[in-house]
From Swiss-Prot:
Purpose: Transferase involved in the biosynthesis of the lipopolysaccharide (LPS). Catalyzes the transfer of a polymerized O-antigen molecule from its polyprenyl diphosphate membrane anchor to a terminal sugar of the lipid A-core oligosaccharide, finalizing the biosynthesis of the lipopolysaccharide. May also be involved in a feedback mechanism to regulate O-unit synthesis, based on the availability of O units on the periplasmic face of the membrane.
EC number, as in UniProt: 2.4.99.26
Pathway membership, UniProt: Bacterial outer membrane biogenesis; lipopolysaccharide biosynthesis
Similarity annotation: Belongs to the O-antigen ligase family.
Transmembrane segments: 16-32, 39-55, 67-84, 96-115, 127-147, 168-183, 189-221, 228-246, 324-343, 363-379, 385-401
Name of the protein this chain belongs to: O-antigen ligase
Keywords noted in UniProt: Cell inner membrane, Cell membrane, Glycosyltransferase, Lipopolysaccharide biosynthesis, Membrane, Transferase, Transmembrane, Transmembrane helix
Catalytic activity: a lipid-linked O antigen + a lipid A-core oligosaccharide = a lipopolysaccharide + a polyisoprenyl diphosphate
Disruption-associated phenotype: Loss of the gene reverses a known growth defect in a Salmonella mutant that otherwise accumulates O-unit intermediates.
A GO BP annotation: lipopolysaccharide core region biosynthetic process
Length: 404
């Protein structure tokens, strides 16, 4: 009797422990300077997952019998191929280890295993509140840097010093929007305050790609949740901002100032002979096989070939600035196909629950993950080479949402 009671008490703590690990993992994911603690969380997640799988090995394989996991597995295998063809296999494997083995493949495995016994409603709440906490902590950490800058006489919106936070601002943005869907007026007031704070930080990145991603995600969110009044208010605000920018058109601000970025209409040397244009030229020279995985491989090939193309804007590589081009360059046509397969699987999984019947609720996790994916990988990934590892957070939660 006593043994049975102790066993039951241990089982009661298991879901709390599992949920806490997943929550902490997402909440701290974008924080800098706490690498050892983030590694500790991952280690605890791995140990817990291994223990639970060993206790009931036959109950876990069904979690991964679907196109989302298959697409993750295919991309992982294709990137193994890209290591084998790499001129620097050591660097390619290091990149593979960071982004795949310790990145999206690991996250895709761990999250659904740890949340296996949770309902869709519980998983949806973890998604929302872990994203919100992560966004809050990221903004809090960045505010400290702004204070330090101010003490040095550096004002906001005049340098690219805060550009590094744009990834987290785009990836986590849909969670902020979902606060509006809570019915209490007090919470809606909190939403307005938090939105003003968010606007400060996103403008401070001086990243037009991030701005565009946030704009598109915001419009999609409002349409899918039928928030027509917010669309009207947003359109008015954009018109006012646009008018203010136009009135300042004759001013010639510093290229690292906010006003300059708002007025800028060119592509920042992305296309013809720029970052993406040159990446496309290199891909055309070897579209089937690819060159090998890793930023160092790309830089090496680019820097070697730039002497043959005197019209290229950048004499040293600064990357392809496009996620799809990066994978295509790395693994050839198979890499492109596998990435498209993964993107398609995610869109299909989220759209099956999102576009068919939109549930106007702050806990609509499928819609939140869909918008996070679109903003970060489809829109921002078209202007920057975004971190592929984070896609494992999306796929991991999507698999967890299939449990029940």
């Amino acid at each position: 009797m006593l043994t049975t009671s102790l066993t039951l008490n241990k089982e009661k703590w298991k879901p709390i422990w599992n949920k806490a690990l997943v929550f902490l993992f997402v909440a701290t994911y974008f924080l800098d300077g706490i690498t050892r603690y983030k590694h500790l969380i991952i280690i605890l997640m791995v140990i817990t997952a291994i223990y639970q799988v060993s206790r009931s090995p036959k109950s876990f394989p069904p979690l991964f019998k679907n196109s989302v996991f298959y697409s993750v597995a295919v991309l992982s295998l294709i990137l193994v191929y890209s290591i084998l063809i790499s001129p620097d296999m050591k660097e390619s494997f290091k990149e593979f280890e960071n982004t795949v083995l310790e990145g999206f493949l690991l996250y895709t495995l761990l999250i659904p295993v740890l949340l296996k016994d949770e309902t869709k409603e519980t998983v949806a709440k973890i998604v929302l509140f872990s994203f919100l906490t992560s966004l809050g902590l990221r903004c809090l950490a960045e505010s400290i840097l702004y204070i330090e800058d101010y003490n040095k006489g550096i004002m906001p919106f005049i340098s690219y010093a805060h550009r590094h936070m744009s990834d987290s601002m785009v990836f986590l943005f849909p969670a902020l929007l979902n606060i509006w869907l809570f019915r209490k007026n007090a919470i809606k007031l909190v939403f307005l305050v938090l939105s003003a704070i968010y606007l400060f930080f996103i403008l401070g990145t001086l990243s037009r790609g991030a701005w565009l991603a946030v704009l598109i995600v915001g419009v999609l969110w409002a349409i899918l949740n039928r928030q027509w009044k917010l669309i009207g208010v947003g359109a008015i605000l954009l018109a006012i901002i646009g008018a203010l920018v136009i009135t300042q058109h004759n001013n010639k601000p510093d290229p690292e100032h906010l006003l300059y970025k708002l007025q800028q209409t060119d592509s920042s040397y992305r296309y013809t002979n720029g970052t993406q244009g040159t990446a496309w030229i290199l891909i055309q020279e070897n579209p089937i096989k690819g060159y090998g995985y890793g930023n160092d491989v790309y830089d090496g090939v680019y820097n070697k070939r730039v002497v043959d193309y005197p019209t290229w804007t950048f004499k040293e590589s600064i990357g392809p600035h496009n996620t799809i081009l990066y994978i295509w360059f790395s693994a050839g046509i198979l890499g492109l196909a596998s990435l498209v397969y993964l993107y398609g699987a995610i869109i299909r999984e989220t759209a099956s629950s999102t576009l068919r019947k939109v549930e106007i609720s702050p806990y609509n996790a499928h819609l939140l993950l869909f918008l996070s994916f679109v903003g970060f990988y489809i829109v921002r990934g078209n202007f920057e080479q975004v971190d592929i590892a984070q896609i494992g957070i999306i796929t991991g939660f999507l698999l967890a949402l299939r449990n029940r």
